[in-house]
Amino acid sequence: MAPTRKFFVGGNWKMNGRKKCLGELICTLNAANVPAGTEVVCAPPTAYIDFARQKLDPKIAVAAQNCYKVTNGAFTGEISPGMIKDLGATWVVLGHSERRHVFGESDELIGQKVSHALAEGLGVIACIGEKLDEREAGITEKVVFEQTKVIADNVKDWSKVVLAYEPVWAIGTGKTATPQQAQEVHEKLRGWLKSNVNDGVAQSTRIIYGGSVTGATCKELASQPDVDGFLVGGASLKPEFVDIINAKQ
């Protein structure tokens, strides 16, 4: 019997919001029904991690959107996993396509960050995904498997890892992978984990989808057997995020 994977919904607020509007969003989330079978995590901008943790109901966890690969030091503008934990956050998003493509983070650096964050006791939402030209060239699998390998090489305990598949061409573009496209990649990723890690990890690791997820698209995506939740961008700042949290209901 395959283990039941708890549905996981992450809200990535990116570089958005001020205390007033985020406070209003938090009030909406605190009043929302969060199903017992769903884990919800919100990732505010670094400046608002403490604010979000103090205001959010304990049923919703808090994540950082990034961290560095060491504990302390002369790294201007960076934040360490220890600092993130000190603020009450328990997760970190690593390898997001915007970190890869806007800020030039390499697979190697992302792997080092994953290793350090896990060693420090944070849960990791590890992001992978292909660009449009890579999908059109037919190398989606090659790209996401290479990205996954670097992450896997740095993971000792998979119970603290959620894999987020985000086709880069679907992020912030309004284009969503079809449920069938998402399922196909998720199924292949689970197969990769089975072949390259082990069957237990493949069965228990949650693989979530990111890329223009909305209240309108979430239910059909959530019905796919290998889609274990979502990493939501723009829609996580709107009341429809509550609909996405309840996509399995």
UniProtKB/Swiss-Prot annotation:
Report any one BP term from Gene Ontology. Answer: glyceraldehyde-3-phosphate metabolic process
**Known pathway:** Carbohydrate degradation; glycolysis; D-glyceraldehyde 3-phosphate from glycerone phosphate: step 1/1; Carbohydrate biosynthesis; gluconeogenesis
Give all N6-succinyllysine modified positions: 149, 156, 194
Q: Which residues form the active site?
A: 96, 166
Q: Which residues carry this modification: N6-methyllysine?
A: 194
Q: Which PROSITE patterns match?
A: TIM_1, TIM_2
Q: Which residues carry this modification: N6-acetyllysine?
A: 14, 156, 194, 238
Q: Which CDD domains match?
A: TIM
This enzyme catalyses: dihydroxyacetone phosphate = methylglyoxal + phosphate; D-glyceraldehyde 3-phosphate = dihydroxyacetone phosphate
**What InterPro entries has UniProt attached to this entry?**
Aldolase_TIM, TIM_sf, TrioseP_Isoase_bac/euk, Triosephosphate_isomerase, Triosephosphate_isomerase_AS
- Grouped into one coarse class, the protein's main location is cytoplasm
* Binding residue positions for substrate: 12, 14
Q: Name one Pfam family in it.
A: TIM
3'-nitrotyrosine modification, residue list: 68, 209
Record location of the Glycyl lysine isopeptide (Lys-Gly) (interchain with G-Cter in SUMO1) cross-link: 142
Gene Ontology molecular function terms on file: isomerase activity; methylglyoxal synthase activity; protein homodimerization activity; triose-phosphate isomerase activity; ubiquitin protein ligase binding
Recite the UniProt keywords alphabetically.
Acetylation, Cytoplasm, Gluconeogenesis, Glycolysis, Isomerase, Isopeptide bond, Lyase, Methylation, Nitration, Phosphoprotein, Ubl conjugation
User: One cellular component GO annotation, for this chain's record?
Assistant: cytosol
User: Where is it localised?
Assistant: Cytoplasm
Phosphothreonine found at = 173, 214
Stated family = Belongs to the triosephosphate isomerase family.
Q: How does it assemble?
A: Homodimer.
Functionally, this protein is described as follows:
Triosephosphate isomerase is an extremely efficient metabolic enzyme that catalyzes the interconversion between dihydroxyacetone phosphate (DHAP) and D-glyceraldehyde-3-phosphate (G3P) in glycolysis and gluconeogenesis. It is also responsible for the non-negligible production of methylglyoxal a reactive cytotoxic side-product that modifies and can alter proteins, DNA and lipids.
Q: What's the name of the protein?
A: Triosephosphate isomerase
Per the UniProt entry, what species is this protein from, by scientific name? Mus musculus
